[in-house]
A protein has these predicted regions:
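A short beta-strand-loop structural module common to alpha/beta enzyme folds
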Residues: 25-41, 201-203
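Glycine-rich, highly charged phosphate/nucleotide-binding loops
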Residues: 41-53
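N-terminal glycine-rich phosphate/adenylate-binding segment common to multiple enzyme folds
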Residues: 50-101
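Long, charge-dense
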Residues: 80-128
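Extended, basic/helix-rich recognition subdomains
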Residues: 152-244
């Protein structure tokens, strides 16, 4: 098959490694991680633009995304089917499936996950940084910048309320996928040490990523959206569904 993969850059190393061994021809377009930080409704617009830019020579378009806080809701297939994993977010793909992610999530509250993509590409930059919810709410300001704008008392309250997005976390889970350069785990450990958080290595699983680029998409793990139909959120455990 001739496939097109549109993926979040958070999967850069993993998708490249999987595509290198795919039995199919797979052309890749990576989109910036910062799409997740846009105001509600804007990520689907950017995703649709990327899909509409694909020419009609492909048998299917693969989406290297989870539902991502409804970031794919409303996205429509045009000339060929869309294939996407049944996943709320990217951690499902890094851990190989929904069941393993749910098991870990339920037993390890307050966990912040790290992979090579987050360490290398986790910061939103460029035009997307200016458009992000964080920038529009002032969540990207330092405490000193807030003091200068709002006064000391107001600044401390706003900083605690808006800018401490990790205050409910206390644990780093490093997910090695077998594609990282030497020393990256040590970088992750250093980040945990800087925050005084606990640290754990949770082995990653490339199974779902490989299935995405290898074809043979089973209905339990993947949604196939035929031309003319769109993606919608599902609330019956299937996570995503198709709609005319």
């Amino acid at each position: 098959m001739n496939l097109k993969l549109i993926s979040c850059e958070i999967f850069y190393r993993e998708m490249c490694a999987a595509v290198a061994h795919s039995p199919h021809r797979v052309d890749i377009t990576f989109l910036p991680k910062g799409l997740h930080d846009l105001p509600p409704g804007q990520m689907p617009v950017k995703m649709q633009e990327a899909i509409d830019a694909v020419d009609g020579t492909y048998d299917a378009i693969l989406l290297g995304y989870g539902l991502c806080n409804n970031g794919l809701a409303g996205v429509r297939a045009r000339n060929c089917p869309l294939i996407l994993p049944r996943a709320h977010d990217c951690i499902t793909l890094f851990l190989g499936g929904r069941d393993r992610y749910r098991e870990y999530f339920d037993t390890h509250p307050g966990t912040y996950f790290l992979t090579s993509g987050w360490l290398e590409r986790g910061e939103t930059s460029g035009d997307l940084a200016e458009l992000s919810v964080q920038a529009q709410l002032g969540m990207n300001l330092t405490l000193q910048e807030m003091v200068e704008q709002y006064g000391e008392d107001n600044a401390e309250y706003l900083y605690e309320t808006l800018c401490q997005g990790t205050r409910n976390y206390s644990h780093f889970a490093w997910i090695p996928m077998g594609v990282e350069p030497p020393g990256m785990e040590q970088t992750a450990r250093q980040k945990a040490g800087e925050r005084g958080w606990s640290f754990e290595t949770v082995p990653g699983d490339m199974t779902l990523i490989r299935k995405l680029v290898n074809g043979g998409w089973n209905e339990k793990e993947f949604l196939t959206v035929p031309p003319g139909s769109a993606v919608k959120a599902a609330y019956d455990g299937s996570i995503v569904a198709g709609i005319q």
